[in-house]
């Protein structure tokens, strides 16, 4: 992340011996501006098909780090001194980001900032002069768009992960407490609740008074935002849903953590097609990306680092490319002629939406 130096500068004066991170794909011995750190493998099966875990042996003067693969002897792969200094506690980060680009756009200025006191995992939703944000404490908070003044908040039972949506004076969101809520956007009063059987982590799309949202109970729902009535429910999903669904003139399209992109009939929720693209591992699912559509195609990116164009009528792959090593983000130009994505290597790429072959128009670091 671009603000890493804020962390290392904050902890540098203290006697930090080791940053420890886990659930990684492999073991890594790192330095964070001189401060020792490691990333430990997850306990999932590795490339040889064996699960394993990490062991830390803390002695009087050292931290010894081992990997224990099931059925084998543990192997030490790193060690750190508890006495030897690794970095200058009065020093600074090895480098800082270059913010000089900001001087080229003097009219772009921060308007306001608020401290919520809780983690925020969803994007904000805006309706007229209000901004709605969900947080890790389960609050849906409304701020004034003009100055960031807090207008009201509503507390659900658990964290809010999916991005809310607001229209016609109603704000809709899902919560990990297994409920979908409809609130009066003016004062935050509860209008209705739709109960699910599992946490609701999906983002919301509202169109023509109908909210479209997926949950973790294998169900995708269309809900009247004024009454809370479920218009239809599709129950054929095999994984949980977190994405913001794409709503077109006659289709609702979304991905789930089951290797699948779904297209449903907008009117009745019946399945029109499913796309898997030959994906076999759940972790490669097109589930986090928010799909976009243009030129008769749906465009997605996925954790396999591919960008894909899919025929919107039949779900067949038009093209799929690994050229740019993209991952889980995609955007559409206002005129629908270009799609944009960011890569794993700090770049933005642009592709044409026309044609039946991938065409990168430009890439920028």
State where each predicted segment sits.
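Short loop/turn segments that connect beta-strands within beta-propeller blades
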Residues: 144-148, 184-188, 224-228, 265-269, ...
């Amino acid at each position: 992340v671009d603000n890493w130096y804020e962390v290392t500068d904050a902890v540098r004066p203290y006697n930090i011996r080791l940053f420890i991170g886990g659930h990684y794909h492999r073991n890594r011995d790192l330095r964070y501006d001189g401060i020792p750190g490691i990333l430990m493998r997850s306990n999932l099966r590795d490339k040889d098909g064996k699960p394993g875990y990490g062991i830390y042996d803390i002695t009087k003067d050292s931290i010894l780090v081992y990997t224990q693969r099931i059925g084998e002897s543990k192997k030490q792969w790193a060690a750190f001194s508890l006495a030897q200094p690794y970095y200058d506690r009065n020093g600074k980060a090895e480098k800082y980001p270059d913010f000089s680009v900001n001087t080229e756009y003097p009219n772009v200025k921060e308007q306001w900032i608020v401290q919520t006191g809780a983690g925020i995992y969803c994007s904000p939703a805006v309706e007229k002069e209000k901004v709605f944000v969900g947080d890790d404490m389960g609050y849906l908070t409304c701020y004034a768009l003009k100055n960031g003044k807090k207008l009201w908040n509503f507390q659900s039972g658990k964290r809010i992960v999916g991005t809310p949506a607001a229209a016609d004076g109603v704000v809709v969101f899902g919560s990990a407490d297994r409920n979908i809520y409809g609130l009066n956007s003016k004062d935050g009063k509860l209008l209705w609740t739709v109960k699910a059987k599992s946490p609701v982590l999906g983002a919301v799309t509202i169109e023509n008074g109908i909210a479209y949202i997926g949950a973790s109970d294998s169900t995708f729902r269309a809900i009247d935002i004024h009454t809370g009535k479920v218009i239809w429910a599709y129950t054929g999903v095999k994984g949980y849903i977190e994405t913001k669904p794409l709503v077109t003139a006659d289709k609702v399209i979304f991905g789930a953590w089951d290797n699948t992109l779904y297209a449903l009939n907008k009117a009745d929720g019946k399945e029109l097609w499913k796309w898997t693209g030959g994906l076999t591992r759940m972790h490669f699912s097109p589930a986090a990306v928010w799909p976009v559509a243009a030129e008769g195609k749906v465009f997605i990116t996925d954790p396999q680092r591919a960008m894909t164009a899919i025929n919107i009528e039949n779900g067949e792959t038009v093209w799929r490319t690994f050229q740019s090593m993209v991952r889980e983000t995609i955007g559409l130009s206002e005129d629908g002629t270009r799609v944009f994505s960011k890569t794993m290597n700090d770049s933005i790429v642009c592709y044409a939406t026309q044609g039946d072959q991938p065409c990168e128009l430009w890439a920028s670091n």
